[in-house]
């Protein structure tokens, strides 16, 4: 099952950044090849997928918009780096190629409020086009309607902000 595959990858220390970037590039190339494509493409993700979306926006040039939902490990300490994830994604902030929307719960522990502050300060310092929204009553994974961490008001607002952002940046 997909859950079994995800568990096996997590148990093995996560997916290598290079493999993720290759997969994301291939997906974007496919979307852009479709007859219905307008030539623009966005990327988004939650949790480690938020990390991957930010990383893709920095390392790949194909994206016109990036949405990072509570991206865990965008800011990594030296002792968190591994062979599969050798660089903290925030080290690539200057290379961000697209506008970014960030959605974060203030009760989250990955990323913490302080990490979100640092992430935002780095984007601002680099002169990047960014928009961050924080939800004081939400924690990690507040979109996940099937889980106890779901926070409806934050999720509804976040989805609206995401659809609006993509509409503005991809049309």
Where are these regions (language model features)?
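N-terminal cap/leader regions of alpha/beta-hydrolase-fold enzymes
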Residues: 1-171
């Amino acid at each position: 099952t997909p859950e079994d595959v995800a568990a096996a990858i997590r148990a093995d220390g996560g997916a290598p950044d290079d493999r993720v970037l290759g997969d994301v590039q291939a997906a974007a190339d496919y979307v852009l090849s479709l007859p219905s494509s307008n030539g623009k493409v966005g990327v988004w993700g939650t949790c480690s997928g938020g990390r991957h979306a930010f990383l893709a926006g920095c390392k790949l040039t194909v994206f016109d918009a990036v949405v990072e939902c509570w991206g865990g490990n965008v800011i990594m300490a030296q002792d968190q780096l591994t062979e599969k994830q050798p660089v903290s994604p925030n080290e690539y902030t200057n290379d961000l190629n697209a506008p970014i929307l960030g959605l974060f719960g203030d009760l989250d522990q990955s990323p913490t409020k302080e990490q979100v502050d640092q992430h935002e300060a780095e984007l601002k310092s680099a002169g990047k086009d960014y928009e961050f929204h924080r939800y004081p009553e939400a924690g990690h994974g507040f979109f996940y309607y099937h889980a106890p961490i779901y926070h409806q008001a934050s999720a509804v607002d976040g989805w609206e902000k995401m659809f609006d952002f993509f509409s503005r940046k991809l049309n």
